[in-house]
């Protein structure tokens, strides 16, 4: 049953010499930017395919008087993982490939390496640009990650969502308001 329920790749991770010794019981996909297609369509926004397009869209959303991103990093004693997820993504896309990323992870290059600093500069575009984040920059570190996306499902007096995009792993749908969970994949998507 296990072999039919999971990809051969996942099965292979727990297999040695043709014998399955262990296996995945869950998987979470990272690097997802969640959005609500209906909200994009209603305003004529296109789904960005590049970082530059995402920044241009964020600028447009701000110019339209709204907030592009929900962003929360508070996670009790483990708050750093949310920024790390962003940094990992950006480094893999803007750095010198997986070899440099692997060096960073194994502490063979320092946090002040130009590749790491470049990734931090990209992330800073989201975190420190006025109007980009619900509650502003200061709210990022005090907003619980599990509630960070809530404004995406709430409307202001003009019928606009509190934010349009939220970057988080696939597990975040279990934190969504109940009505949004029922519509996952249709009301809100990646």
Name every feature range the model reports, one short phrase each.
Residues 58, 104-143, 190:
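Glycine-centered hinge/linker elements that transmit conformational signals in sensory
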Residues 17-19, 90, 94, 176-190:
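Ligand-binding "clamshell"
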Residues 1-8, 13-15, 38-49, 151-158, ...:
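Extracytoplasmic "Venus flytrap"/periplasmic binding protein-like
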Residues 70, 163-168:
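Paired acidic/hydrophobic, glycine-rich loop segments that form the ligand-binding mouth/hinge
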Residues 1-31, 61, 82:
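Hinge/lid segment of periplasmic solute-binding proteins
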Residues 51-55, 137-155:
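Short helix-initiation/N-cap motifs at beta->coil->alpha
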Residues 22-28, 43, 69-78, 101-115, ...:
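Short beta-strand->loop
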Residues 1-6, 92-118, 181-184:
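Short, solvent-exposed loop/beta-turn-alpha elements that line the ligand-binding surface or hinge
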């Amino acid at each position: 049953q296990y072999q039919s329920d999971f990809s051969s790749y996942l099965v292979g991770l727990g297999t040695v010499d043709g014998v399955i010794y262990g296996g995945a019981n869950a998987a979470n996909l990272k690097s997802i930017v969640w959005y609500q297609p209906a909200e994009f369509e209603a305003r004529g926004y296109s789904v960005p395919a590049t970082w530059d397009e995402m920044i241009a869209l964020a600028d447009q959303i701000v110019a339209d008087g709204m907030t592009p991103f929900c962003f929360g990093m508070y996670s009790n004693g483990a708050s750093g993982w949310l920024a790390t997820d962003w940094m990992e993504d950006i480094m893999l896309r803007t750095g010198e490939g997986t070899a440099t990323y692997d060096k960073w992870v194994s502490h063979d290059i320092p946090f002040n390496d130009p590749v790491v600093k470049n990734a931090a500069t990209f992330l800073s575009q989201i975190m420190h640009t006025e109007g980009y984040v619900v509650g502003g920059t200061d709210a990022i570190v005090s907003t619980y990650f599990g509630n960070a996306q809530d404004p995406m499902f709430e409307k202001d007096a003009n019928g606009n969502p509190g934010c349009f995009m939220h970057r988080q792993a696939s597990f975040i749908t279990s934190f969504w308001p109940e009505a949004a969970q029922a519509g996952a994949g249709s009301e809100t998507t990646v």
